[in-house]
Amino acid sequence: MATMAPGCLLPIHYHTGTAEVYTFSGCWRYAEYPDQPQTAGDYLYEPGGSVHTFYCPEDNTEDTVVLLWMEGAQIGFNQDGTLHHINDATSIQHVTETVSAAQGTGPVGYIHGGAAGVVKS
């Protein structure tokens, strides 16, 4: 689940696998598809390899809240086409745990790769 303020802009990127997005509130779009705004109640399926630039319009009157499901890695680029980032399950877990610890929101439950596990709340 992600919450983004009006004006949020992510670097151009693609996913090596599929991505699915369900929008709970607000509005977002891909810059490459300005005629396809996603608003509360919308579901988007995105095939792997689809290149796009995610943004929330600056004139949104509320935060945009989405549930994201991604398979594989996310590969992001700078405006000049150079590599900006590679996010995968391991890097996302690290960032999530680091931010959670900094905010004091408690441990984040994960089933770690290599073995089945139980997430305790």
Language model regions located:
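Ordered hydrophobic segments in well-structured contexts
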Residues: 1, 22, 65-68
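Glycine- and acidic-residue-biased ligand/ion/polar-headgroup-sensing regions
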Residues: 6, 15-33
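Histidine-centered active-site/metal-ligand motif
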Residues: 13-15, 52
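Short acidic-glycine-tyrosine-enriched beta hairpin
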Residues: 20, 30-53
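Long, hydrophobic, well-ordered secondary-structure blocks that form the structural core
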Residues: 25, 44-49, 68-70
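Double-stranded beta-helix
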Residues: 57-121
